[in-house]
């Protein structure tokens, strides 16, 4: 009996997936929010991030703007070239990892958490590259090394499901998995619209959150935020998005 209940439930979910159009649902929810609020949630978070960017924090009494100018005027276009190698870190960093490093080393902030305030700052910094083309390069040896690690992780089959990133986003791209359409990483330039607001769970996510979420979807324990594996996959995805126009925060199912 239990077996048949499971089969019927799966078929029911499949039927719903065929009836719903995720793209239309995104459009509908976006229009509804703009009509009711006049602004999208992601843009609200970005504005909050701008305020925090200019606010002193940590033992050094500095703000992000102390180094990068009021409202980050010296960071315009920076996100379009990330992840990248940073000499002061002697490492490749994505947006999240770089912000964490700067907070700890230059601002004296202890115990940096990947919380909503952190993600709001990251989102604001990313908006400073809006309208610019993604142009991640692999000129430094450590950038090339990290990219290769990301590529290896992309194709690695892991977990009880024996799944890989490539199975979904290369082989099965464009197909429906319940209420979502699997995106094609290169063609859809996915890195250009993260950070993003996800209306399905009412949360602001950075690219690190999205990558970690995919580990969970594959029934594999995700690496911690700022882990090299997350940065490596981020670099792989961002390099594949080269030439795409940055438009953040995205509005995602």
Curated annotation (Swiss-Prot):
Binding site for heme c 2: 165, 168-169, 214
Record-listed heme c 1 binding positions: 64, 67-68, 102
Cofactor-binding details, from the entry: Binds 2 heme c groups covalently per subunit.
Catalyzed reactions: L-cysteinyl-[SoxY protein] + thiosulfate + 2 Fe(III)-[cytochrome c] = S-sulfosulfanyl-L-cysteinyl-[SoxY protein] + 2 Fe(II)-[cytochrome c] + 2 H(+); S-sulfanyl-L-cysteinyl-[SoxY protein] + thiosulfate + 2 Fe(III)-[cytochrome c] = S-(2-sulfodisulfanyl)-L-cysteinyl-[SoxY protein] + 2 Fe(II)-[cytochrome c] + 2 H(+)
Post-translational modification: Cysteine persulfide at Cys-214.
Signal peptide: 1-17
Subcellular location, principal: periplasm
Single Gene Ontology MF annotation: metal ion binding
Top-level EC class: transferase
Superkingdom classification of source: Bacteria
Listed cofactors: heme c
Subunit annotation: Heterodimer of SoxA and SoxX.
Protein name: L-cysteine S-thiosulfotransferase subunit SoxA
Lineage per the UniProt record: Bacteria, Pseudomonadati, Aquificota, Aquificia, Aquificales
